[in-house]
Structure formats: C-alpha cells, structure tokens
C-alpha cells in the first residue's frame, strides 16, 4: 500500500516542499527491509533505525516487510533528521494505523527519539513560511519548535511531544480539520514589549566625542572604527551601542529569526528575535566562521548579525584573509556560498563596529604613557587592515584614555534612552525623505552615488572645504562618498534640511586614519 505525507527541507534560509512516499509491500520478511531513495544523506538513511525503534516503543507492532521510501523531488539532496516523523507517519498510514488516508492538508516535520518522543530541529520558521506560501493550513511539529513557527500568520501550528500524540491528533481530525486549538502567539505584543538592556551609556564617564560618533553611526547605520589605548573604554562603548539602535520592525524581526533558526541558535522559548543582534566573534575565527560555509552551508557571524551589530574587537589581530572576505558583504549586504551541488545566499545587512589599539604596544599618541614602537612598526600594524576595507568604514574615531577628573567627577552622563530618542528622530527624517523620493532604502549609509548627489547638495563654502580635505588627506572617491553620507546623518540629527559647513567639518573629523600622522 502507498501512503503520502508532506514534509519540508531547508536550503539556505528557505524551505522546499518534499513529498514523502511510503510503499508498504505487506509481504512478510525475516526482518524489515528499508530502501530510502531520493538523494538522502547519512542522517536520513539512519532514520530507518530511529523510526523502527520509535514505532515499536510507541506500542505499534508491524510485521517485518519490504518498505520503500521515496523523497521527492529526487534531484534535491535531502539532509537532516526532520524526515523521521513524516516517514514514521507514512509507514503507519500504509500499514493502516491511521483512520485518515489523505494528509494533503498537513505538513509534518520532526526528529524522533528511540522512545517515540519528538526533538526540535533547526529551521522551523522557513518551514512555516513555506506552508503558508503553499496554502497548507496545518503544520505538525515538535513542541520545542512551536513558538517560532507560530509567528507566521495563516498557518495552524500543532505542537506534539511524541509519535503517539501525532497519531491521536490525526485520527481525531475530520476532513483535514483538527479538533484541537492550534498554538498561537501575539507577535505585536512581543515586539511591543519595552526593550531592557543590562548596560547603558550613562555608565560611561567622559568620552563625549566617541559617544557623539556612536550616536551618528547609529542614526545613519554607519560602520565605525574606534582607535585608542588599552583601557580607554572602546569595548565598553561598543557593548552599549545596541541600546541606542532603533527597535526591530516585524519584517526585520522575521528575517532575523529565520537566519537564527536555520543556524540553530534561536532561543526556543522566545520564538521571535525582538532585539537587534549583537555578535562579537573572537579574533581566532576562521573565514568560514565569519561569512558562513561548510559542506552544508550555514550562516556565519556576518549573517547572524543581520539587522544588528557585528563587533570586531582587536581588529588587527584578525587574520588578513578573514578581514578581506568581509569586503563583499559590507558592500553588497549579502553572502553567496557556492558549492558543487548548490549555491546559497544569506543576507548580511549589518552595522560594523570595530576597535583597535593604535600600535603594537597600544600607546601611540597617548599623553600619559610613552609609545615604545618605531614608525615602521606602527605602519606595519595599521597596514594589517587593508585600504579597501578601511574605505568601507564610514567613521574612524580616536578614543583617548579617560582623565581622572572625568572618571571621578562631573554630572551624571546622558543615558541611552535620551540618545535613542534622537537616533529614532533622525531615522524618521531619513525614512520620510527616501519614501518621498520612491527609494527602497531606510538609512543614509545605504545611499548609492546617485542618491548622494540628490540628497547631499553642498554650498560653495562646503565645496571648498571638502576639496581641501580631499587634497590634503589624499582621500579616495569612496571616502568622499562616506563623508557626505555621514554629513547627511549629522544634519538629520539636527533636523536640518540642507548640509552646512559645520556638518561637513564634523564628518571630515571622523576620518582619523586618513590623517598624515597615520600614513
């Protein structure tokens, strides 16, 4: 007897519909003979042992026979343990243990334990989105995956804890309608909750210039590099940067959750990523760990930071090849990983924050300690970061050591909430401007050269200032565009319609590594 069950496989951050066809011959054999066809990987081939034990330990005795399992379409490689449950349901359906013979209204996914219990699998959110796109109304999945799948509207999510629970659920259905309330979450309530951060900018004493630069970076989604001696507060500042970023929209939250779900790092209890990601990989990370890869391509740190912040501490300590692979994601906001069998793309629209010492000893240009490095040593150290990569960082800012009076005295520093209000006001200016122009971008950092010409017009005095800076500092055309983008953001923070000399001068000030004493 032939029985069909609908399931899904995840490739990249998207899911494909898979037909699980089970043929139960009924001819008694000495032992079960499983044949799985349709390009299964090792995990899928091993499912026969898990499925056989799960069926037996769930109380179903099926005589040994010849069973053929086809996973269609046959030209797609099937990977992972998510086919355990649909295969078991297909076998029991073919044997006659189900009172329904049409499961076309159900999508079934899950890994089985030997005792028949269900275990969660990564990538359930793309599966739920696939069910909605294919007009499959019901999704049966492990209980631990329910929260993330339920954020997709238009799909009835039914969490189950065991194979027996699945059969009870299906046997009580009437014409594809399950007699049980589906699992639901209120996405607006999740996103509407006040964000609580364990850190705040009011913790940071002094560093007003650096705080201002971080505010500008957050307002325009600009990449930023902080340069300063050990203990000056670079890492402390970077860890507080997420607290002034604008909240995620529902579309951004859904896209971010998809990536985290596929990578297997999603908090099962949360279901939806409601805060912008903050990723801070160690400098020993490989290029595959940073941008993604593997035999089965998985998202790397740049994709896990999508719609959020990627912080690289001690930037020159990262291997040169690791830093260079970031050039394409920083420019195109996507990562494409090519393999012999497939080519997958992962989104990587993130804000880069990096920190570094100014030299090997860490005290070049420091007022309180003498630098022990020679000029060639400093040049070699800074040269670890290539010019093309530096050009893609809009803001370079020096973070000097904090003086004792600033550390111990003075009024309380401004908190993250006040800074975030200004950032969100500037973002609203940008949103309205780009919407009015019919442009599908949301931040100044995303402007193309043509859009810069449209939105960053300069007066005569500003033109002369920019020309002088370009000549004196030997700036590239890309650095020219970065300065104008940052100047536009500074104007937005002030609510100004036109760029002034003051806006441009501040933006030029944020090109520390272009100055002569760094050359």
PLM regions with names:
Residues 307, 313-314, 325:
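Walker B catalytic acidic pair
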Residues 225-267, 332:
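Walker A/P-loop
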Residues 1-225, 229-232, 338, 479-480, ...:
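Peripheral, non-AAA+ core regions of ATP-driven protein-machinery
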Residues 226, 312, 355:
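Hydrophobic anchor at the beta1->P-loop junction of P-loop NTPases
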Residues 40-48, 61-63, 70-80, 297, ...:
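Basic, amphipathic alpha-helical bundle interface domains used for macromolecular binding and assembly
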Residues 175-216, 220, 247-302:
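P-loop NTPase nucleotide-binding/switch module
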